Design a protein with these regions (language model features):
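SH3/SH3-like beta-barrel fold
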Residues: 207, 220-224, 232
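Catalytic domains of carbohydrate-active enzymes, especially glycoside hydrolases
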Residues: 277-300, 355-367
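Substrate-binding cleft of extracellular glycoside hydrolase catalytic domains
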Residues: 316-367, 371-374
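Hydrophobic faces of well-ordered beta-strands that scaffold small-molecule active sites
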Residues: 264-268, 290-294, 325-329, 367-369, ...
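Substrate-binding surface in catalytic domains of secreted glycosidases
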Residues: 302, 306, 353, 376-452
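Primary recognition of N-terminal secretory signal peptides and signal-anchoring hydrophobic helices
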Residues: 22-216, 246-254, 258
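Boundary/entry segment of secreted carbohydrate-active catalytic domains
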Residues: 187-189, 228, 233-280
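Sec-dependent N-terminal signal peptides of Gram-positive bacterial secreted proteins and lipoproteins
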Residues: 3-28
């Protein structure tokens, strides 16, 4: 009896040891393979809850797009030998400076000094010929040739052709930094999640190099050079070292016109031409202000024209007092005008030319853009306006400042991170905590409100 007890105890001990060591003897393994089109974002769920493959109206093949650490939710398009990717995918993940003008059907890319225009379905960039079609339209959306993206942004890409059940994959890399490279120790199955019970993505051959996306205790999320993303056991990976990856950017070309000291700015509300005559009286006892912004210009019609209350004598007086003049430009006339002008490249150009004409004619040091009718629908158009205006201000050495609402969830779409790259000064209008429309009386801008 004691001998039997010893055998039972020994057996239990051995089993425990196997379990604790993760022995394959007790591992439940799923031999099923995932639907790669579904896994890579090439399907959608119809009204009946059924997964349906995406197709194009033109009959061209769809392509999975593998980004640095995930698959894009927006498919690419294979057209002849070219691959086109969604402009939204490019803007959200690679570079936000691509812009599609629906009014004239052209793609634009704008950097610190130049705005390039590319008509749909043509091999033209700013009237110069290239050996590929720069962009196409599919399902009312603009798709950009990956070669067009590469022309303006430093990226690497690799196209893996469709084979069997596996779709074609466009693998794109574009992020600089240290990459942890591993090599597979044997032939191993990549899975959808870090567990043997999850479906197989692909059989990965021994000696395959992979980039680690997420490190885990037992499984690493990795990416192969040809765009397969999934999980591999840590025990099957050998460390191949760290690779420093560097993609070029043009951040240093975005020069700024700034003051050598802190800006102390005051706005001067000008309702009519005669109000300019009050400058001496209004500033008689003012100290510390080094910038004044008279509210002189308004967008007044659908052709991009401005109304003006500007006064050269006012500018001369301000300069004598050591003040720069950044005249304010607003869109308070009509929200429909704002949308009409900003959504057209031709009208934006006229509008910007008018702004720069007045800035030059009245010897302004800068302009202050104060637009209140920027909805989420036209934010891309507004940002494109700032890109184009910044080119002109940069060239003319005029300060470009822009007014923004206080940061909040509802105004997050204003994309201040992108704005600050374009403009010289981003001004937060940190008030309106309580207004005449509020349910209760209170501070216009309390300390806690301003700090938040």
């Amino acid at each position: 009896m004691r001998k039997n007890v010893r055998y039972i105890a020994l057996t239990a001990l051995v089993i425990s040891a196997f379990v604790l060591s993760g022995c394959d003897m007790f591992r439940k393994t799923n031999d099923g393979k995932v639907d790669l089109k579904w896994y890579m974002g090439l399907t959608y769920e119809d009204d009946n809850g059924k997964d349906v493959n995406y197709t194009t109206k033109s009959g061209d093949s769809v392509v999975a797009v593998a980004l640095e650490d995930k698959y894009s939710e927006q498919y690419g398009i294979m057209k002849d030998a070219d691959v086109f990717v969604s402009i939204d995918m490019v803007k959200d993940n690679i570079d936000p400076r691509f812009y599609y003008d629906k009014s004239n059907g052209s793609l634009m890319f704008t950097n610190a000094t130049t705005s390039y225009e590319m008509p749909l379905n043509e091999n033209v960039i700013d009237k110069g010929k290239v050996n590929y079609t720069t962009c196409i339209k599919e399902n009312k959306k603009c798709y950009i040739n990956i070669e067009t993206v590469k022309k303006f942004v430093d990226i690497n890409y690799k196209l893996t052709k469709a084979e069997g059940d596996a779709p074609a994959i466009l693998s794109i890399t574009y992020k600089s930094g240290k990459k942890n490279i591993m090599t597979t120790d044997s032939n191993i199955e990549m899975r959808t999640k870090g567990d043997y019970q999850n479906l197989i993505v692909k059989e990965i051959s021994k000696g395959t190099k992979v980039t680690v996306i997420e490190s885990g205790k037992n499984w690493d999320k990795v990416r192969t050079e040809n765009g397969y993303i999934g999980y591999i056991p840590v025990s099957e990976l050998n460390d191949s070292g760290t690779q420093e990856v560097s993609f070029k950017n043009d951040d240093d070309t975005y020069t700024h016109v700034t003051l050598d000291t802190k800006v102390s700015l005051a706005w001067n509300q000008i309702y009519n031409q005669n109000a300019n005559n009050n400058f001496d009286e209004l500033t008689a006892n003012v100290k510390g202000v080094n910038v004044i912004s008279p509210t002189w210009f308004s967008l007044v019609d659908k052709n991009g024209n401005l109304s003006s209350l500007a006064d050269l004598n006012y500018v001369e007086k301000a300069h004598k007092k050591g003040m720069q003049v950044w005249a304010l430009v607003n869109d308070f006339t009509d929200r429909k005008l704002t949308k009409k002008v900003l959504t057209s490249t031709a009208l934006r150009k006229k509008f910007i030319n008018n702004i720069m004409y007045f800035a030059d004619s009245y010897e302004l040091d800068g302009v202050n853009i104060d637009f209140e009718y920027i909805t989420e629908e036209i934010i891309d158009d507004y940002l494109q306006f700032l890109r184009e205006l910044s080119i002109e201000c940069r060239a003319a050495k005029k300060v470009l400042s822009v007014d923004n609402y206080a940061p909040s969830k509802w105004s997050a779409y204003y994309d201040r991170k992108q704005q600050i790259k374009l403009v010289d000064y981003l001004i937060i209008m940190n008030y309106d905590e309580h207004t005449s429309a509020s349910d209760e009386a209170g501070s216009v801008s309390s300390m806690s409100y301003a700090q938040n």
